[in-house]
Swiss-Prot record:
This is Co-chaperonin GroES. GO terms for biological process: chaperone cofactor-dependent protein refolding. Belongs to the GroES chaperonin family. GO terms for cellular component: cytoplasm. The keyword Cell cycle does not apply. Coiled coil: none annotated. InterPro entries: Chaperonin_GroES (IPR020818), Chaperonin_GroES_sf (IPR037124), Chaprnonin_Cpn10_CS (IPR018369), GroES-like_sf (IPR011032). HAMAP family: CH10. It is found in: Cytoplasm. The gene is groES. It comes from Serratia proteamaculans (strain 568). Keywords: Chaperone, Cytoplasm. It comes from the Bacteria. GO terms for molecular function: ATP binding; metal ion binding; protein folding chaperone; protein-folding chaperone binding; unfolded protein binding. Together with the chaperonin GroEL, plays an essential role in assisting protein folding. The GroEL-GroES system forms a nano-cage that allows encapsulation of the non-native substrate proteins and provides a physical environment optimized to promote and accelerate protein folding. GroES binds to the apical surface of the GroEL ring, thereby capping the opening of the GroEL channel.
Length: 97
């Protein structure tokens, strides 16, 4: 996949997260709801500050992140794969191993 986000934008590939119902049944796909976790596949150069300097992003390619899946997050198909384009501010946390 070849895509380069601009400024503070981040490209994230959603990760399927397995979840269980209250009765212990494993839910996958649409029954589990959309995951708000994903892997960062591309990052922009950073946020341009008022003084013209560029503040680098905290996230990097390969990070697993938890994000706010709401207004401002745009889904796109690139090479038949769905990816999400979002600002770094839409990312709530980086999952550390």
């Amino acid at each position: 996949m070849s895509i380069r986000p601009l400024h503070d934008r981040v490209i994230v590939k959603r990760k399927e997260v397995e979840s269980k119902s209250a009765g212990g049944i494993v839910l996958t796909g649409s029954a589990a709801g959309k995951s708000t976790r994903g892997e960062v596949v591309a990052v922009g150069k950073g946020r341009v500050l008022e003084n013209g300097n560029v503040q680098p992003l905290d996230v990097k390619v390969g990070d697993i992140v938890i994000f706010n899946d709401g207004y401002g997050v745009k889904a796109e198909k690139i090479d038949n794969e769905e990816v999400l384009i979002m600002s770094e501010s839409d990312i709530l946390a980086i999952v550390e191993a």
